[in-house]
Design a protein with these regions (language model features):
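ACP-dependent fatty acid/polyketide chain-elongation machinery
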Residues: 1-67, 245-257, 352-366, 411-413
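A glycine- and small-aliphatic-rich helix-loop capping segment at beta-alpha/alpha-beta transitions
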Residues: 22-27, 113-127, 177-180, 200-213, ...
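Glycine-/small-residue-rich "gating" segment that lines the acyl/pantetheine channel
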Residues: 124-131, 172, 176, 180, ...
Length: 413
C-alpha cells in the first residue's frame, strides 16, 4: 500500500530558555543558555546543583488550580505545550472528525516529583496518606489522556516510553498512524520534569551529570574536551501532525513534511553506546531509507549530543559512518548545550528546532564548544548560529538508555 504524506501544522513548547516556541527559538539563535542553579529544593548534599528549569510557569488560564493539584508538573507542561500546538495549527475538532484525531505523547520517567511526595506521605503516615489521585497524577500516558479529553479526540491515544528517545518515537509512530490511514491528525511529542531530588540524585549517583557547579551555563558542552556529563532539563514539546491533503484542504499553515523515520537498538549496554555508534548509525540509515534520499541531501543534523564523554564520540562516529565523504559538509549541532537534556521531551523539542531551522534557514549553534575532543571533528556550528540558503532536509537524532535509538527526517515544504 502507498503511504500518505504527513506534514507538521502546529508547534508548542516549554523549555528552559522560553515558554513558547518563538521565544525559545530566538534564545537559541542568540546562543543563550537556560541552565541555572536549582532553587526548588536544597541541593547542599548533591554533587550537581543545577539544571535547565522551566521558569515563570503559570497555567491557570488553561488548567484550574483544583485540577493542577491532581497533576505532576510534567503533565501540566505537556498540556500547555499541547494547547499551544493545537491553537497554532488552527485545527478544529468536530463531531464528524473527532474519531480521526488522536495523540501520541510520551515521557521518559513520568511524574517523579509526585511519586516522591506520595512515598514520603506513605512513610510518614501510612497508606491512608497517599493521595487518591496518585496514580493518574504520575503515569506516563496522562498528557495524552488529558489532551484527548480536553479536545474530545477519539482517535488513537498512545504513549511510548523509551527513555530519552520517547519524543522521537512518539512523533515517528504518530506519523505512521497517519501515513497508514488510522488517523488524519495527531498531537505528538513528549514532556518531562525530572529536576527533582530523586532525579538529580539518581542520575548523579550514576555519575551521568556534569558537576560544573561554579559555572552552570558552561556545563553542557557537547564534543568539548572538558565535558563531564549531561545537564538535566525540564519542559515539553508538542507537534500537530496531519495528512497532507487534509491540511491543504483546510488551508493550514504547513511547517515541514515528515519524510523519514528510523529506529534501532544497540544491543550493547544499559547506559553506554558502542564506541562505533553502530546502533545510532542504523537508526539514521533506516530513516534515510524511509525518506528515499541520500545522506548528502541532509543539510543539518540536530544531534543527540548530550555532553557525555562516551555518547558524543559514538554519535560522531555514527555520523561519519552514515554520511561518508558528506560528513565533513553536513552541519551538526547540539541544542542541548543551551537547553540541557529534556530526556523524554528532548526529541520533541529538538524536532521543533529542526523544523524551525528549515523554516528560517538558520542553524542553531553548539555553545561552549571551546576545544573539540579528539575525533570530534565535524562541523558542529560552534558558538554562533549560522544563516544558510539551501537547507532542504534536516535530521533529528535521539538515543536512550537501554540502547534505544530513533531518527526523524524533515523536509522543507
Amino acid at each position: 500500500m502507498s503511504k500518505r504524506r504527513v506534514v507538521v501544522t502546529g508547534l508548542g513548547m516549554l523549555s528552559p530558555v522560553g515558554n513558547t516556541v518563538e521565544s525559545t527559538w530566538k534564545a537559541l539563535l542568540a546562543g543563550q543558555s537556560g541552565i541555572s542553579l536549582i532553587d526548588h529544593f536544597d541541593t547542599s548534599a548533591y554533587a550537581t546543583k543545577f539544571a535547565g528549569l522551566v521558569k515563570d510557569f503559570n497555567c491557570d488560564d488553561i488548567i484550574s488550580r483544583k485540577e493542577q493539584r491532581k497533576m505532576d508538573a510534567f503533565i501540566q507542561y505537556g498540556i500547555v505545550a499541547g494547547v499551544q500546538a493545537m491553537q497554532d495549527s488552527g485545527l478544529e475538532v468536530t463531531e464528524e472528525n473527532a474519531s480521526r484525531i488522536g495523540a501520541a505523547i510520551g515521557s521518559g520517567i513520568g511524574g517523579l516529583g509526585l511519586i516522591e511526595e506520595n512515598h514520603s506521605s506513605l512513610v510518614k503516615g501510612g497508606p491512608r496518606k497517599i493521595s487518591p489521585f496518585f496514580v493518574p497524577s504520575t503515569i506516563v500516558n496522562m498528557v495524552a489522556g488529558h489532551l484527548t479529553i480536553m479536545y474530545g479526540l477519539r482517535g488513537p491515544s498512545i504513549s511510548i516510553a523509551t527513555a530519552c528517545t520517547s519524543g522521537v518515537h512518539n512523533i515517528g509512530n504518530a506519523a505512521r498512524i497517519i501515513a497508514y490511514g488510522d488517523a488524519d491528525a495527531m498531537v505528538a511529542g513528549g514532556a518531562e520534569k525530572a529536576s527533582t531530588p530523586l532525579g538529580v540524585g539518581g542520575f548523579g549517583a550514576a555519575r551521568a551529570l556534569s558537576t560544573r557547579n561554579d559555572n552552570p551555563q558552561a556545563a553542557s558542552r557537547p564534543w568539548d574536551k572538558e565535558r563531564d556529563g549531561f545537564v538535566l532539563g525540564d519542559g515539553a514539546g508538542m507537534l500537530v501532525l496531519e495528512e497532507y491533503e487534509h491540511a491543504k484542504a483546510r488551508g493550514a499553515k504547513i511547517y515541514a513534511e515528515i519524510v523519514g523515520f528510523g529506529m534501532s537498538s544497540d544491543a550493547y549496554h544499559m547506559t553506554s553506546p558502542p564506541e562505533n555508534g553502530a546502533g545510532a548509525a542504523l537508526a539514521m540509515v533506516n530513516a534515510l531509507r524511509d525518506a528515499a534520499i541520500e545522506p548528502a541531501q541532509i543539510g543539518y543534523v540536530n544531534a543527540h549530543g548530550t555532553s557525555t564523554p562516551a555518547g558524543d564520540k559514538a554519535e560522531t562516529q555514527a555520523v561519519k559512518s552514515v554520511f561518508g565523504d558528506a560528513a565533513r559538509r553536513v552541519m551538526v549541532s547540539s541544542t542541548k548545550s543551551m537547553t540541557g537534556h529534556l530526556l523524554g521531551a528532548a526529541g520533541a523539542v529538538e524536532s521543533i528546532f529542526s523544523i524551525l531551522a528549515l523554516r528560517d534557514q538558520a542553524i542553531p549553534p553548539t555553545i561552549n564548544l571551546d576545544n573539540p575532543d579528539e575525533g570530534c571533528d565535524l562541523d558542529f556550528v560552534p558558538h554562533e548560529a549560522r544563516q544558510v540558503s539551501d537547507l532542504e532536509y534536516a535530521l533529528c537524532n535521539s538515543f536512550g538508555f537501554g540502547g534505544t535509538n530513533g531518527s526523524l527526517i524533515f523536509k522543507k515544504i
